[in-house]
Amino acid sequence: MTKMKMDVTIELDLDGDDWEEVDVLSDKCVEDILEDVHIDDPILVSDVRITLPANIRIKNFKKEIRDLILANLDVPTTVSAGSWQIVSSFLRGIEYSEIGGRERNSKLSWKPFEDMHAQILVNALAYAQRVDILVKLKSYIDSNSYLKNVPEPMFAFADTDSMASTTTFSEYAEPVHSMNARKKILLLHYETTSKEKEDFKWFKCNLKNVLEKERKEGKDLEVFDVKVWEKDDRGNVFQELEKHYDLFPHIVVCFNKSYIEATKPNSKSKMPQFRKSISDKLNVEFHMNGNRNLRGRCVLMSEVEKVTDTYWAAVTNQYPFPGSFEPFVKRLLRDGKVKKQSHNNANDHHEDSMNYSITQ
């Protein structure tokens, strides 16, 4: 059967009387209507600020909220931005590019992360730019209808001595291996330049030397470098963080330009996510303790005169290194004496000053 093509022409008589009843809007009228249409600016991640109590964990969220988050993250695997894979990579402290194909197609589940602090999940959603989920979550939080149960309050740190003797910690804070966090000073830092790395090595070496000498006097404290912790993750560095974080008597933060830049909102820094999480937890703890800093110790490295952008550090003592190293150590040891070394150099008139030379 042969198909035939046919051209059809339709003529409209626009001058006829039938068209007089049709309303045709003028350009001026259309402009006036559009002026009355108000379109709000898009909501930014920075507009949705959520700060959760430090004792709230992901498992404490109501099931409907956890399901809501997963449902909104359950996007086609061809879409990577803002997906579950982006959020889970943040929670695990790895880059999205490190996730293999099989993992990217794995089933969505909270099980590996349910004991993590809920604030880390909020930070992960912000990192994934999921404003839609954050807005929904905030509505539940503002109405105080987001928890299935209310956990015990976060341990309130009164002072160093009481913290060292108490055993009232959450079930997830107790160590499961030989690391005794109660006797370790957590050292949080991040360097990118040779100068910053040199300064940090200088600082850490002196702090270790002082603490080793003080251990002979009964001050049983030692340095625990966050960089070492990252390497010895025992399978999940974030689970390790949840188990031990509440136990450290001091968390020393070395503020240099790279660290300050890396901890700014929406920073593009390559600072490991694990370290960012500790920085976030310090801010949350400060908020939970009534805007009182009880464990954070602010050390100013060279080229940094003052810290103003970090909540807890801005209202507490700031110790420039090396100038204020001695009062800094005294703060760590409370009433402990700082050992001093004499210099035999005839040109050095500052006898009994602290020896800042780096041990090779």
Curated annotation (Swiss-Prot):
Record protein name field: ACT1-like protein
Its biological purpose: May act as an adapter to facilitate downstream signaling for the receptor complex composed of ilcr-1 and ilcr-2, which is a signaling complex that modulates neuronal activity and animal behavior in response to sensory neuron input.
Tissue distribution of the protein: Expressed in neurons.
Disordered: annotated segments: 339-360
Assembly behavior: Interacts with the receptor complex composed of ilcr-1 and ilcr-2. Also interacts with pik-1.
